[in-house]
């Protein structure tokens, strides 16, 4: 028995590895009676944009008057923000209660943190009687714990080279893992364009008699202090200057329009346009005005490419603070960032992180500061726009620092 939620979180976060297979978790959930099948779910997979797309879907459904659960990772401020209903985290009391009730059972089945989080979200959403639940895939798709759900619709954002040690070394291999969320009769949207990935999606759609919707190109894009664009019959406004959000918003529109046509939900054009007025933390998020500080969770090459595209909208000089996990292609990420402004390389405490010295090896003209707080302090003294990026785990620490100020 845990006395408080901090003890419960400490226990759950210690359960990072397991010897069992994904099929063992599925069998365990079947022994519970498959409670997840009582939920109406949307599923979001892909290399980049999963969190933003999940947030757009949640916000639009919420504007339509629905009670909406969302499951995302990693957390931004507290472990509890992985599981939310509308704009509220799961209650600490419920989280503590269910872990105290189920701890021994979950330990006996050797469940991992992500499997436990998935189960808690299902129990919580059922208890609170949500109308819809939007699930973001943690990693891949086929073997991900969230793949126990039977969604009414899905988005597979894009396919890029990331997590190759787990998902495969080619676009086709990675696409197969992501396409593992495609179920019989599923309607899913994607903005992926690479031929190898689309061939995989087409094959999966044929096998499962699923319907793939490929998003259209946005038209009349204008970027000032926000973004405006036309998508089909919609004139969309987004409260960001990050162009990559156009793709995520378009995927959300495409899926929800299709589900409306299939009479799987009721939603209006106004609901969609108003729902897209939301913003997603750590995605080109400004956390300070003077000096201007922007944090972005780009954590792979494609994410950095999209960040660089967004940085082109900022004319003033920039200083970039960077850290990354050791299993990422950080050298390629840093090479892309070198032309964007002065680089300060740092490190943060994580089992998966690496030293600032390792990150900076072989690079010229960069500043190395081991302590990430000191690195940010140094960047703030430069009297330039400060950009902080490289890892979602790093950015969550940075965000907490600025929100406490």
Each language-model region and where it sits:
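Short functional linear segments
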Residues: 1-46, 53-66, 71
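ATP-dependent carboxylate-amine ligase catalytic core
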Residues: 29-37, 63-149, 167, 195
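Nucleotide phosphate-binding/pyrophosphate-handling subdomain across enzymes
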Residues: 38, 132-135, 145-155, 159-164, ...
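Short Gly/Thr/Asp-enriched flexible loops that form oxyanion-binding sites at enzyme active sites
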Residues: 57, 142-152, 399-402
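Acidic, Mg2+-coordinating active-site environments of NTP-dependent enzymes
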Residues: 129-136, 153-235, 249-269
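Beta-strand->loop->alpha-helix junctions that form or flank phosphate-binding loops
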Residues: 191-192, 204-223, 239-243, 267-278, ...
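C-terminal helical cap/extension that packs against the catalytic core
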Residues: 194-204, 209-213, 224-226, 292-295, ...
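A glycine-rich beta-strand to alpha-helix segment
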Residues: 375-403
